C-alpha cells in the first residue's frame, strides 16, 4: 500500500510529477537502538526502503489511495491529525498496539458498492508491539489480514472517500517503528527477588521525557507475559508520578511519599531496578534516588548509584569460568585439558562367565555442564552430565563436582541446563518415543529429585531436542524439531501449587533452523544461535534479542556443530572434525584438538 497509493497521494497533494515508491523488501527486524528521526532513512538495500513523508488527505483520492495514505500517516505519532484526516470519525484511537509487518508481502483487494467501499490489505506479519510496550514475533508465514470500510456519506467525509471502519491497532513496518518509537529496557525482579529480569519496551516519541516514562512504567503492573512468570516490581504502584531530572551523566529520581515506606530489602531492590533501567536505557551512567527530596537509604550507603552498586542482582555478573568439553575418550575436561571430575567416575564391574568380577567400561560422557556461580559465592561447584551406556541408553549424572551420582536413565537426555538457584533442566526421551521435560534442585549434600514440567498446548506434541533456561530462572529457550526442520521458541517458567509449567511460547528468529546443541543464553537479554537460514545449508551464528527484535550475524567454520555462549566470554563452537574453537576478535582460533560439545557454565 505504500507504493502506488503513495505516489497517487503525492501527485494529488503536491501536483508533483515524480514521487518515490516505498514498497520495500523488509526482513525479520534487525535494527539497533531507536533514535529520533524524520520519516526518512538511509537505504542500504538499493533504494527499496526509502520513506516518503506523510500528507494530509486531499480531494479526489480513491479508496485504495485513502487507505494507503492513512497507513503511511499512522507512523507520524507526533501529529495524529494527519492520519485522522483520512477518517470519517476523527475521534478514533488505536487501543490494541501495533502489527509490525514486512512490506514486501502485501497484497490489496478492494471493491466499491455505491457510497461504500472495502479495501483488504494482507501483509507478512512479523510481530506485535503490545499496549504495554513489549514486542513478540509471529510464527513464520503469519499474515496480518485487515479490511477497511470506507464511505462518502458521513458528515465528515464531505463527499470524499474516508475510512469509517478499521481495526483498533496500527500497522507499521520496521522502519516506521524505529522512527516513531524509542526503545528502552525495564528491569523487574525474579520471583524470589534475587535477580533482575529485563524486558525491552517501545515508547512513542510523543513521550518527550523518556526517563520519567520509564520510571513510571516500573510503578505500573508488570507486563503480562512476565507477570505470569511471577516477575514483580519492588516499586509500589501509585498514581503519583515520579520526576526524573538529568544533569550531565546523573539522573535524579524523586519518588512520591509511598516509596518512603519500603523496607530495607525493598529499597535495595527498587534502587537496583531504577539504576539498571535508566543506565541500560542510555539515560545516564549514575542515578540518585530521593523521596520528597530526601535520599532513599540503601544498604550500599551509595548517594549516586551505578551498575556496579547493584551488580549482585545482575545474573550476567558471574564468577569467571571457562568452558568444559568432552574429549575423544568421553571424558569431560576443562578448557585447559584438566579433567572436570575429581575423582572420575568409577569403572563399573562386570561378571565374567566364570563368575569372577572384572572392570567394565567406564561410562562415556556426551555432555557435561557446570552450574553458573555468582561472584563471591562459596561451596563446591555443581555439575550435570549425560553418559552413553553400553546398551546405548543414557544416564543423567548430577551433584558436586567431586561426588556426582547417577540420577536417571532413559533412551536419551538433552544437554543439561542450569539456573543460578541450582535448578537443572533436561528433556528425557524414553524408548517408546515419549518425552518429558524435567527439572530438579541439586545441592552439594542431597540427592537430586526431579519433577515433570508441563508445557502449554502450542508445543505439547512437538519433539523438543534442546532446552536452555535463563540464568535468572524465569525463561527457557527450546529447540523444537518437526518434519519441516527445527525452530527456536521462548517460553516463561510458571510455578504454582500445581507444579511447573512452560507457557507463553513464541517463536524467535523464525527464518532460521537451529542445531540441537546450537542455542545458549549469551546474556539475560540475548540468545546465541548456531543455525542455517531457510533455503541454505550454510551454518551461521546469530546473536538474537530474546524478544526477536534485533539480530546480528557471525560467520563460523563450515563444520560447526555446537555452540556455547556466556556473558563477557568469547563465543565457542564445537566442530564435526572434533575441535573446539573460540572467537578471538574477528577470527576463530582452535583451542582444543580432539574434543567437542563445549559448554560454559549455564
UniProtKB/Swiss-Prot annotation:
The keyword NADP is annotated on this UniProt entry: no
Covalently attached lipid (S-diacylglycerol cysteine), positions: 25
Compartment(s) of residence: Cell membrane
UniProt xrefs under InterPro entries: GerMN, Lipoprotein_LpqB, Lipoprotein_LpqB_C
Keyword flag Cytoplasm: no
GO cellular component: plasma membrane
Residue ranges, compositional bias (Low complexity): 348-359
SMART domains reported in the protein's UniProt record: Germane (SM00909)
Keyword list, A-Z: Cell membrane, Lipoprotein, Membrane, Palmitate, Signal
Signal peptide: 1-24
Protein topology in the membrane: Lipid-anchor
Lipidation positions, renumbered (N-palmitoyl cysteine): 25
Principal localisation: membrane
Region described as Disordered: spans on this chain: 338-362
The family this protein is said to belong to: Belongs to the LpqB lipoprotein family.
Name of this chain's protein: Lipoprotein LpqB
Underlying gene: lpqB
Amino acid at each position: 500500500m505504500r507504493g502506488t497509493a503513495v505516489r497517487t497521494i503525492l501527485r494529488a497533494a503536491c501536483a508533483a510529477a515524480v514521487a518515490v515508491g516505498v514498497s520495500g523488501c523488509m526482513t525479520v527486524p534487525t535494527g539497533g537502538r531507536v533514535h529520533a528521526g524524520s520519516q526518512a532513512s538511509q537505504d542500504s538495500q538499493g533504494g527499496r526502503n526509502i520513506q516518503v513523508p506523510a500528507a494530509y488527505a486531499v480531494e479526489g483520492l480513491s479508496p485504495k489511495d485513502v487507505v494507503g495514505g492513512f497507513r503511511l500517516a499512522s507512523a507520524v505519532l507526533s501529529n495524529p491529525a494527519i492520519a485522522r484526516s483520512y477518517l470519517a470519525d476523527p475521534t478514533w484511537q488505536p487501543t490494541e498496539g501495533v502489527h509490525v509487518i514486512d512490506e514486501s508481502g502485501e497484497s490489496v483487494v478492494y471493491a466499491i458498492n455505491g457510497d461504500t467501499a472495502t479495501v483488504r490489505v494482507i501483509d507478512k506479519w512479523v510481530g506485535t508491539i503490545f499496549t504495554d510496550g513489549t514486542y513478540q514475533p509471529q510464527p513464520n508465514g503469519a499474515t496480518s489480514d485487515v479490511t477497511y470500510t470506507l464511505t462518502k456519506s458521513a458528515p465528515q467525509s464531505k463527499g470524499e472517500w474516508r475510512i469509517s471502519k478499521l481495526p483498533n491497532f496500527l500497522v507499521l513496518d520496521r522502519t516506521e517503528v524505529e522512527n516513531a518509537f524509542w526503545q528502552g529496557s525495564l528491569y523487574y525482579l525474579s520471583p524470589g527477588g534475587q535477580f533482575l529480569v529485563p524486558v525491552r519496551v517501545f515508547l512513542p516519541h510523543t513521550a518527550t521525557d523518556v526517563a520519567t516514562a520509564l520510571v513510571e512504567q516500573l510503578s505500573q503492573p508488570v507486563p503480562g507475559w512476565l507477570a505470569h512468570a511471577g516477575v514483580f516490581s519492588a516499586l509500589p504502584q501509585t498514581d503519583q508520578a515520579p520526576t526524573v531530572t538529568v544533569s550531565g551523566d546523573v539522573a535524579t529520581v524523586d519518588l512520591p511519599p509511598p516509596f518512603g515506606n519500603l523496607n530495607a530489602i525493598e529499597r535495595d531492590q527498587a534502587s537496583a531496578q531504577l539504576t539498571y533501567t535508566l543506565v541500560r536505557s542510555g539515560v545516564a551512567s549514575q542515578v540518585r534516588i530521593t523521596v520528597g527530596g530526601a535520599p532513599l537509604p540503601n544498604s550500599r550507603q551509595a548517594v549516586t548509584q551505578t551498575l556496579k552498586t547493584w551488580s549482585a542482582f545482575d545474573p550476567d555478573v558471574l564468577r569467571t569460568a571457562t568452558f568444559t568439553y568432552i574429549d575423544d575418550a568421553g571424558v569431560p575436561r576443562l578448557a585447559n585439558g584438566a579433567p572436570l571430575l575429581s575423582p572420575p567416575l568409577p569403572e563399573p564391574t562386570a561378571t565374567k562367565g566364570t563368575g569372577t568380577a572384572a572392570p567394565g567400561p567406564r561410562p562415556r560422557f556426551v555432555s557435561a555442564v557446570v552450574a553458573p556461580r555468582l561472584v563471591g559465592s562459596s561451596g563446591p561447584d555443581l555439575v550435570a552430565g549425560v553418559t552413553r551406556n553400553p546398551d546405548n541408553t543414557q544416564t543423567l549424572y548430577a551433584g558436586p563436582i567431586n561426588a556426582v551420582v547417577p540420577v536417571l536413565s532413559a533412551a536419551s537426555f538433552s544437554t543439561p541446563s542450569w539456573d543460578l538457584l541450582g535448578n537443572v533442566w533436561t528433556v528425557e526421551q524414553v524408548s517408546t518415543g515419549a518425552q518429558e521435560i524435567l527439572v530438579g534442585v541439586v545441592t552439594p549434600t542431597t540427592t537430586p529429585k526431579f519433577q515433570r514440567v508441563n508445557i502449554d498446548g502450542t508445543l505439547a506434541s512437538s519433539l523438543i531436542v534442546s532446552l536452555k533456561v535463563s540464568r535468572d530462572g524465569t525463561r527457557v529457550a527450546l529447540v523444537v524439531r518437526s518434519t519441516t526442520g527445527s525452530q527456536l521458541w521462548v517460553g516463561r517458567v510458571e510455578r504454582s501449587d500445581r507444579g511447573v509449567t512452560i507457557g507463553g511460547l513464541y517463536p524467535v528468529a523464525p527464518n532460521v533452523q537451529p542445531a540441537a546443541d546450537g542455542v545458549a543464553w549469551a546474556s539475560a537479554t540475548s540468545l546465541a544461535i548456531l543455525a542455517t537460514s531457510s533455503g541454505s545449508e550454510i551454518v551461521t551464528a546469530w546473536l538474537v534479542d530474546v524478544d526477536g527484535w534485533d539480530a546480528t550475524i557471525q560467520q563460523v567454520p563450515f563444520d560447526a556443530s555446537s555452540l556455547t555462549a556466556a556473558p563477557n566470554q568469547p563465543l565457542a563452537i564445537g566442530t564435526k572434525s572434533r575441535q573446539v574453537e573460540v572467537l578471538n576478535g574477528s577470527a576463530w582460533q582452535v583451542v582444543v584438538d580432539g574434543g567437542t560439545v563445549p559448554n560454559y557454565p549455564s
